Amino acid sequence: MNKVVLLCRPGFEKECAAEITDKAGQREIFGFARVKENAGYVIYECYQPDDGDKLIRELPFSSLIFARQWFVVGELLQHLPPEDRITPIVGMLQGVVEKGGELRVEVADTNESKELLKFCRKFTVPLRAVLRDAGGLANYETPKRPVVHVFFIAPGCCYTGYSYSNNNSPFYMGIPRLKFPADAPSRSTLKLEEAFHVFIPADEWDERLANGMWAVDLGACPGGWTYQLVKRNMWVYSVDNGPMAQSLMDTGQVTWLREDGFKFRPTRSNISWMVCDMVEKPAKVAALMAQWLVNGWCRETIFNLKLPMKKRYEEVSHNLAYIQAQLDEHGINAQIQARQLYHDREEVTVHVRRIWAAVGGRRDER
């Protein structure tokens, strides 16, 4: 099994392919990417037969920006007989994965795949039963075993394979299912909620997104991102020349500061979170974020980088490298992650967490 399927946002296949080719090459796992425009997935074909498994084991999934999910697969199964699609699929998986912890029958996230998705949901139940009898799946779902993937690209046409549950997306198709809150000021609120799910482990929410924390939202109007912070019972400085939603102001948790997010400087020294979703050149936003992190004005930040029309992967990589270089120069240890979220459009979302400073700084980081 020398192929790795990577699911991505339709229209971003080239970026996904450029990224996996680059990062696989850094680990001396060589191959080539098969790209079909607007397909919603990329296939990276390794030259060595066992390198697909090596890639999804050794390259941290969290280091990928444009992939929503990945799994290693064998050859394409074609012309599955409508009267018995299950037997060929089970046959392909035998000897490949044993006692899998979960079955996911998936498609790419495209309009053309919506009808196929309905079939996948119905097909999952009988396939799961037969796979359990054949030993391909454990008798109960467990996060400690590999995930079995069956990926349909057309009716009667699928790839079969697996991913490791400790190095994949926990979500079906790599998409968290979030519901838009009726009282939120804008749909952008779902970006920050999804970012929390993707970047912060669920068992750390109570500690890192805690009641009573202080936060800053740069470019806050009308308050989609502030809404998520208020919902977590934080005190928020919302910085924007535009007005905030009255419903947020009525909570008493929001202080609206009518000024430019690029010029604002915090007066408090105990700000845990700074979030930012401003429509501006990515280099300018990256420079501002680096300034906040280097000066210790916040402990963690989530921000969006708007993407140019061309060379998107190169642009994002350049901006992330700039932030890393600034942190290194000032002796600051930090974790940086970036992902094009489901609710992102022509942008990527970045999370940076300061861990400690090598030089004297904030007391909570020594």
Swiss-Prot record:
<feature type="binding site">
    <location>
        <begin position="221"/>
        <end position="224"/>
    </location>
    <ligand>
        <name>S-adenosyl-L-methionine</name>
    </ligand>
</feature>
<dbReference type="InterPro" id="IPR029063">
    <property type="entry name" value="SAM-dependent_MTases_sf"/>
</dbReference>
<dbReference type="InterPro" id="IPR040739">
    <property type="entry name" value="RlmM_FDX"/>
</dbReference>
<keyword id="KW-0808">Transferase</keyword>
<feature type="active site" description="Proton acceptor">
    <location>
        <position position="306"/>
    </location>
</feature>
<feature type="binding site">
    <location>
        <position position="188"/>
    </location>
    <ligand>
        <name>S-adenosyl-L-methionine</name>
    </ligand>
</feature>
<keyword id="KW-0698">rRNA processing</keyword>
<protein>
    <recommendedName>
        <fullName>Ribosomal RNA large subunit methyltransferase M</fullName>
        <ecNumber>2.1.1.186</ecNumber>
    </recommendedName>
</protein>
<feature type="binding site">
    <location>
        <position position="240"/>
    </location>
    <ligand>
        <name>S-adenosyl-L-methionine</name>
    </ligand>
</feature>
<dbReference type="InterPro" id="IPR011224">
    <property type="entry name" value="rRNA_MeTrfase_M"/>
</dbReference>
<dbReference type="InterPro" id="IPR048646">
    <property type="entry name" value="RlmM_THUMP-like"/>
</dbReference>
<dbReference type="Pfam" id="PF21239">
    <property type="entry name" value="RLMM_N"/>
</dbReference>
<dbReference type="GO" id="GO:0006364">
    <property type="term" value="P:rRNA processing"/>
</dbReference>
<feature type="binding site">
    <location>
        <position position="260"/>
    </location>
    <ligand>
        <name>S-adenosyl-L-methionine</name>
    </ligand>
</feature>
<dbReference type="Pfam" id="PF01728">
    <property type="entry name" value="FtsJ"/>
</dbReference>
<comment type="function">
    <text>Catalyzes the 2'-O-methylation at nucleotide C2498 in 23S rRNA.</text>
</comment>
<dbReference type="Pfam" id="PF18125">
    <property type="entry name" value="RlmM_FDX"/>
</dbReference>
<dbReference type="GO" id="GO:0005737">
    <property type="term" value="C:cytoplasm"/>
</dbReference>
<feature type="binding site">
    <location>
        <position position="277"/>
    </location>
    <ligand>
        <name>S-adenosyl-L-methionine</name>
    </ligand>
</feature>
<keyword id="KW-0489">Methyltransferase</keyword>
<dbReference type="GO" id="GO:0032259">
    <property type="term" value="P:methylation"/>
</dbReference>
<keyword id="KW-0949">S-adenosyl-L-methionine</keyword>
<comment type="subunit">
    <text>Monomer.</text>
</comment>
<dbReference type="InterPro" id="IPR002877">
    <property type="entry name" value="RNA_MeTrfase_FtsJ_dom"/>
</dbReference>
<keyword id="KW-0963">Cytoplasm</keyword>
<dbReference type="GO" id="GO:0008757">
    <property type="term" value="F:S-adenosylmethionine-dependent methyltransferase activity"/>
</dbReference>
<comment type="similarity">
    <text>Belongs to the class I-like SAM-binding methyltransferase superfamily. RNA methyltransferase RlmE family. RlmM subfamily.</text>
</comment>
